[in-house]
């Protein structure tokens, strides 16, 4: 007897923003700038349940009840600002902001409830297993480049909030003639939260 439930979904929220400004030498502006902002948000609730319920199982060599979650949830934001002002007297403000948020509520359950086993021919191997192998990522990147009299400001924020509920349960059951019994919940999660902000300012020439 074999029952399995699997969730292998790939869920992503991606955002990007870019700002570009170019000034020639004849530009008399005393102030210029670029602003780029990007926000990526995931609000995810997932659940997978493998269940054997209200069953009488006779003479089974093995009973396997397996719940598996094996996917990825990604939030990524990218902000890019480029200012190529070449005017001699201008001041350039170049700003980039990136925010990435992952809010994850995940459940992986293997449940045997009100199950009766008998085996007149030998012993039964019972496996009740819940396992989660998710990849959960929140990442933000900003990059700023200003040419001329410039100021570069960059901010990258990432937030990863994950509630992973992994359960293996055998309840209200009467198991007879059992050779081996394996009931466990296993997690092998990869969780990454990363930010990167970079800015390059080149001095202006002229008066």
Describe each PLM feature range:
Residues 1-207:
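Low-complexity, glycine- and small/polar-enriched segments
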